[in-house]
UniProtKB/Swiss-Prot annotation:
GO terms for cellular component: plasma membrane. The chain crosses the membrane at residues 14-34, 51-71, 86-106, 121-141. It is a multi-pass membrane protein. It is found in: Cell membrane. InterPro entries: UPF0756_TM. Keywords: Cell membrane, Membrane, Transmembrane, Transmembrane helix. Pfam families: DUF441. This is UPF0756 membrane protein KPN78578_11500. Belongs to the UPF0756 family.
Length: 148
């Protein structure tokens, strides 16, 4: 029996390797291993909770310099006195808002998810992006199509 999904995953993993993007390659290889082993029973949990777990891990990585003391409190306080830092704060708020709209849109219009996923994988593999794209992309789409 021919497994088209496995072939697509292998192609995307190859794209990750060709573009020297180990994040994509490793992620897809892990999914392939899960798919072809008894671990595939965990897919419903991964589909439901994977995004939340990923955001938690990403947030830990972003907050680690504050927690470790590498980013001292004085630097954090000074960020409110520099126009570039204030702009960064504003952009962070905007992008978080877009991500929230994106989560809502992905839940209400799941047919858009496939396009968002393909676009994100291509962006990560070909342009060295990071896979936070689907949420923000869905948020941007929500602005175009008027859904919140």
């Amino acid at each position: 029996m021919f497994d088209t999904t496995l072939l697509i995953l292998l192609g995307l993993a190859a794209l990750g390797f060709i573009s020297h993007n180990t994040t994509v390659a490793i992620s897809i290889l892990v999914l392939i291993i899960v798919r072809v082993t008894p671990l595939n029973a965990f897919f419903p949990w991964v589909e439901k909770q994977g995004l939340t777990v990923g955001i938690i891990i990403l947030t830990i990585g972003v907050m680690a310099p504050i927690a470790s003391g590498t980013l001292p409190p004085s630097t954090l306080i000074h960020s409110f006195m520099n126009w570039k830092s204030l702009l960064a704060i504003a952009v962070g708020v905007f992008v978080s808002w877009l991500g929230g709209r994106g989560v809502s849109l992905m839940g209400s219009q799941p047919h858009l998810v496939a396009g968002l996923l393909v676009g994100t994988v291509l962006g990560v593999a070909l342009f060295r992006g990071v896979p936070v794209g689907p949420l923000i992309a869905a948020g941007i789409i929500s602005l175009f199509i008027g859904k919140s």
